[in-house]
């Protein structure tokens, strides 16, 4: 566990006036329990508050940036931006896991890299920033670290966004659709110049195929195509 909180504050772009808020946001229930601390010292309540703040700030930004979007399109973007998968990516980028206060059992079970645990800690951090410095500072954190993918997904579906597979997975889940299924349907060319065709399907009605020089790139392009169709038909 790292204790140089100044480095973490630099990574997130906010220096706490009251560092107790930051420490609480980083304190998992397992650590508080082992130290016999009251529930008010762990990050669960901050997570609860941060979830609401995040939802509001993301919704506010989307409505402002896309006045012509129907509710369905806005919901697709929001569902991805507040998803555990996306918040997990945010946590990894700022190195949040390295600074968490965990109980011994959680530490041994890999808590520093668990998706749900890190996503919850990001929500707690948003609440901590809000309590420390107000909603405008929380908004700056959300814009800087969470809304970066929104422009790539919403404004330019043909942009070089690299995680359409992750976005499609989360959106399918939020819409109660089957999980995307990826199938390599064709491989052509010599070993040094192989081309792959990958199909992604959601249920039996929504599918797309794409070519690429790797299975990964073909899968991402196919996921991008299905994502575009979901956006076009969302109302």
What are these regions (language model features)?
Residues 1-235:
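Double-stranded RNA-binding/processing signature
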């Amino acid at each position: 566990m790292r204790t140089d909180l100044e480095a973490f504050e630099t990574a997130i772009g906010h220096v706490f006036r009251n560092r107790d808020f930051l420490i609480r946001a980083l304190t998992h229930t397992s650590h508080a329990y082992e130290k016999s601390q009251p529930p008010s010292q762990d990050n669960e309540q901050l997570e609860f508050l941060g979830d609401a703040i995040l939802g509001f700030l993301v919704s506010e930004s989307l409505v402002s940036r896309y006045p012509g979007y129907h509710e369905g399109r806005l919901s697709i973007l929001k569902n991805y931006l507040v998803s555990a998968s996306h918040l997990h990516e945010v946590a990894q980028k700022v190195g949040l896991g390295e600074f968490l206060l965990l109980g011994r059992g959680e530490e041994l079970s890999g808590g520093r890299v668990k998706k749900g645990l890190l996503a919850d800690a990001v929500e707690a951090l948003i609440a901590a920033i809000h309590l420390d410095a107000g909603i405008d500072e929380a908004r700056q954190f959300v814009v800087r670290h969470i809304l970066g993918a929104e422009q790539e997904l919403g404004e330019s579906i043909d942009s070089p966004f690299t995680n359409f597979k992750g976005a499609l997975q989360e959106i399918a889940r939020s819409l109660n659709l089957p999980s995307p299924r990826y199938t390599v349907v064709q491989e052509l060319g010599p070993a040094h110049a192989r081309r792959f065709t990958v199909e992604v399907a959601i249920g039996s009605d929504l599918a797309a195929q794409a070519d690429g020089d790797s299975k990964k790139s073909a899968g991402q392009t196919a996921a991008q195509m299905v994502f575009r169709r979901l956006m076009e038909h969302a109302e």
